[in-house]
Curated annotation (Swiss-Prot):
Record-given protein name: UDP-N-acetylenolpyruvoylglucosamine reductase
GO molecular function, one term: UDP-N-acetylmuramate dehydrogenase activity
NCBIfam families, per the entry: murB (TIGR00179), PRK13905.1 (NF010480)
Enzyme class (EC, first level): oxidoreductase
PANTHER family linked to this entry: UDP-N-ACETYLENOLPYRUVOYLGLUCOSAMINE REDUCTASE (PTHR21071:SF4)
Length: 322
């Protein structure tokens, strides 16, 4: 099947005006933490928010757009992705203390800021409430998009407002009241005039309580130590693969089914944490997805519970994207 080349895709824009980096046929295994998957037809790293808006305004409306951060919660199928993948972590990484007083402080973090960096930044300014973010391997944009959380805390517990950008390159400021937020789920409240389905987070303001620098830093260190002991950080993975079902833990159910160490090719259910699937060498996305399917079917057959994936699975099966 013929696919548009880079020149035809960008025919509506003078690429000399773009200040970011635009590439074609980009291997996505370079950009996802599983280190597996196919190619992106086009790949763009914007220079800043203004450059991103310019790119989106002129990108063909019938061509898909996928936004990523560190790619830590993402599986790109081996057939790759049509359209364009836009990465935010390299440039949309502003991090600043907006205000601070006796009642706490307000921090702004761009979508590309790693969650652990935000946790450390808050601790260094004697603010508490963001320590749990040190346990999340992705970026602020991804954490906002899925209401990432751990140890009983969730991202949107701390959000005061956010900025977003849509397919037309329009940047808006929004509040939590504009969203339906739940466990690992965030959805923009729709109105009759909401005709743009693609809206992405570009940053957020986080309201935190006053704390003590050393106690917050110690909490971050404790959490990171726990991650090292309980998670297979020595292998490429995407973090927790499945959401925890109500009243239970996905890892316990998977282990109960005897699936720790279960392997297909170079993809394996971690022997350290059963809710992790690791790449032991040169795993393909299809091998990883086959394990996901096997785990879901085994747990459902044994318990009646159908595990829901926490990771996003996108792209085309097999083949390659030109």
């Amino acid at each position: 099947m013929d696919t548009p080349d880079l020149q035809s895709r960008t025919s509506g824009i003078d690429t000399r005006l773009l200040r970011g980096e635009l590439r074609q046929h980009e291997p996505m295994k370079r950009h996802v933490s599983w280190r597996a998957g196919g190619h992106a037809a086009c790949f763009y790293q914007p220079a800043d928010l203004e450059d991103l808006a310019l790119f989106l305004r002129h990108w063909p409306k019938d061509e898909p757009v996928v936004m990523i951060g560190l790619g830590s919660n993402l599986l790109v199928r081996d057939g790759g992705l049509p359209g364009v993948v836009i990465t935010l972590h390299a440039k949309l990484n502003d991090l600043s203390l907006v205000e601070q007083n006796e009642s706490g402080g307000l921090i702004y973090a761009g979508a590309g800021v790693p969650c652990a960096k935000l946790a450390r930044f808050a601790a260094s300014h004697n603010l508490t409430g963001a320590e749990f973010l040190a346990g999340i391997p992705g970026t602020v944009g991804g954490a906002l998009a899925m209401n990432a959380g751990c140890y009983g805390a969730e991202t949107w517990d701390r959000v005061e407002r956010v900025t977003t950008i849509d397919r037309s390159g329009i940047v808006r400021e929004r509040t939590p009241e504009d969203y339906q937020v739940g466990y690992r789920h965030v959805e923009l409240q729709r109105t009759p005039s909401s005709d743009t389905p693609d809206v992405w987070f570009t940053g957020g303001w986080f309201r935190l309580r006053p704390g003590k620098m050393e106690s917050s830093r110690q909490a971050v260190r404790t959490l990171l130590t726990a991650r090292i002991k309980t998670q297979p950080l020595g292998f490429p993975s995407a973090g927790s693969v499945f959401r925890n079902p109500p009243g239970d833990h996905a890892a316990r159910l998977i282990e109960q089914c005897g699936l720790k160490g279960f392997r297909i090719g170079d993809a394996m259910v971690s022997t350290l944490h059963a809710n992790f699937i690791v790449n032991c060498g040169h795993a393909t996305a299809s091998e990883i997805e086959a394990i996901i399917d096997t785990v879901q079917n085994a747990v459902h057959q044994a318990t009646g519970i159908r595990l829901i994936t926490e990771v996003r699975i996108i792209g085309q099966l097999g083949g390659s994207t030109q």
